[in-house]
């Protein structure tokens, strides 16, 4: 299994959220903080299930959840993450869907996040061992994430 470009994962969540917003106007629009939290869960689940990272980018523990520098840099100036979805964004979404293992992970993470506000999502994340044991503004180690998420997956099974 190859490492996915993080942009493709972000775009999968962008397209998914845009569809949800069209179906229900009360749905919260995807935020930068939320997509980074979702990526944290994708990485953790991928490590737990496949023993490899889903993407190569570092995840930092921050006061308000997690940060992924490449995502923050690329999307910081974007007014709305679901505005202006072009064909390239749709193609990234479709590429994730074409990978059954990765698609299963993102769908599981999305199902977990559905109905949770960004505040609830970040509050949960900040009570989890990988975030709590990582000093602020430092990289959350993949090994720490793998150990934590493997235990979660065992509980679910």
Please name every model-derived segment.
Residues 1-157:
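Domain-edge interaction signal
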């Amino acid at each position: 299994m190859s490492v996915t470009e993080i942009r493709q994962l972000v775009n999968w969540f962008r397209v998914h959220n845009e569809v949800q917003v069209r179906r229900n106007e009360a749905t919260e629009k995807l935020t930068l903080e939320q997509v980074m939290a979702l990526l944290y869960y994708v990485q953790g689940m991928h490590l737990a299930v496949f023993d490899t990272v889903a993407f190569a980018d570092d995840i930092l523990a921050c006061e308000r959840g997690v940060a992924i520098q490449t995502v923050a840099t690329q999307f910081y100036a974007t007014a709305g993450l679901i505005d202006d979805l072009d064909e390239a964004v749709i193609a990234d979404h479709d590429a994730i869907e074409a990978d059954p293992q990765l698609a299963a992970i993102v769908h599981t993470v999305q199902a977990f996040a559905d109905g949770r506000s960004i505040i609830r999502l970040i509050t949960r994340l900040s009570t989890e061992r990988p975030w709590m044991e990582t000093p602020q503004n430092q990289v959350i180690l993949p090994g720490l994430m793998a150990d934590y998420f493997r235990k979660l997956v065992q509980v679910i099974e």
